């Protein structure tokens, strides 16, 4: 950012305002802007005490008092800053996912989940026959991030099923 963007400009409307323009239909825009600037000037000369109470006596101005126009600008700056932080975090996450597109062998692939976890017969069946393929397919769609992730996951699972069937046929033929 430039320094001119960071420093507040006096007598300029820096905060976009939404207002009812139906009553201002016949008034030129320049006059409306001049009136807005006058309102900001008046407001900047008013004082607030430590509790936020309003008084017009500038002799009672305290060090920590802040005009509300400055507070509005500060809130807008904070919201823009928070949005930028969120964008940066998500963009760095995406770059990490793209860089890790090479398949990595997990230590858990060689673990017999059914024996390790135990549980009901249904849980053992799912852990043996479904979960490893489902997790591998979910890793695939997390890396690729396709437009239709469910279709890609389904096609991957069908492909794995065909590979398992052909592997069983080959093992039966060799016996």
From Swiss-Prot:
Compartment(s) = Nucleus
Pfam families (alphabetical): Dpy-30
Alphabetically sorted, this entry's keywords are: Nucleus
* InterPro entries listed in its UniProt record: Dpy-30_motif, DPY30_SDC1_DD
Q: What is this protein called?
A: COMPASS component SDC1
- Carries keyword Nucleus? yes
For the keyword Nucleus, the answer is yes
Annotated region Disordered: where?
1-45
Family indicated by similarity:
Belongs to the dpy-30 family.
| A GO-annotated cellular component | nucleus
């Amino acid at each position: 950012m430039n320094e001119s963007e960071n420093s507040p400009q006096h007598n300029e409307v820096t905060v976009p305002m939404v207002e009812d323009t139906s009553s201002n239909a016949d008034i030129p825009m320049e006059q409306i802007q001049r009136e807005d600037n006058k309102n900001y000037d008046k407001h900047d000369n008013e004082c607030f005490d430590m509790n936020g109470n309003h008084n017009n006596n500038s002799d009672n101005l305290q060090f920590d008092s802040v005009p509300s126009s400055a507070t509005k600008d500060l809130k807008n700056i904070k919201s823009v800053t928070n949005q930028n932080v969120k964008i940066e975090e998500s963009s760095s996450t995406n770059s990490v996912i793209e860089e890790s597109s090479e398949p990595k062998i997990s230590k858990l692939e060689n673990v017999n989940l059914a024996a390790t976890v135990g549980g009901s017969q249904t849980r053992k069946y799912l852990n043996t026959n479904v979960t490893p393929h489902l997790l591998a397919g979910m890793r695939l769609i997390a890396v690729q991030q396709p437009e239709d992730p469910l279709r890609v996951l389904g096609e991957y699972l069908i492909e794995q099923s065909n590979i398992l069937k052909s592997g069983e046929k080959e093992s039966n033929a060799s016996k």
